[in-house]
Amino acid sequence: MRIYSLNGEQWLMRQAGQERWRQATVPGSVYADLMRDGTLPDPFYRENELEAFALLENDFVYQRVFEAEETMLQSRKVLLRCEGLDTLAHVSLNGQPVGYADNMHITRERDVKPLLLPGENVLEIRFDSPIRYALSEYEKRPGWCSTDAIPGFQHIRKAHCMFGWDWGPRLP
């Protein structure tokens, strides 16, 4: 078995619906990439949390272009392993759906051998807004939740403290 890591700084990211791609690092986060780019001030400083919160009402797309090595193309299977996809993630390879992640606590693996192309391949991951999802689910199934947190956080399999806590900001 050979392991090819797609981690690193070769990723690009953009807000869905916008054309401008930005440099991104994986593993990482939308917040870290937007801070590094200068688009977002430090959300842990003063009232900057509100600006960060507004940004995360949008969806974001991450993209990585990579070359499929000959050993990959000749392999019986090529598993794409995603660890820690932070929740509502649509994964595609060369425009073909590979899978969907709706739980940040589960590692995902898929055989992508049939989708690999000789030469350049494009891996794309679209992250839907966890804020919109939580609020939408809360409207359908309201229930008690912490007043310090975003309503509906209990309906999404994501670290609940990211939705706000008495000791921390609301930065899902």
Can you say where each PLM-predicted feature lies in the sequence?
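Accessory beta-strand-rich segments of carbohydrate-active enzymes
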Residues: 2-17, 29-38, 52, 57-172
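Solvent-exposed adhesion/ligand-recognition segments of exported proteins
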Residues: 22-27
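N-terminal glycine-rich cofactor-binding segment
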Residues: 43-53
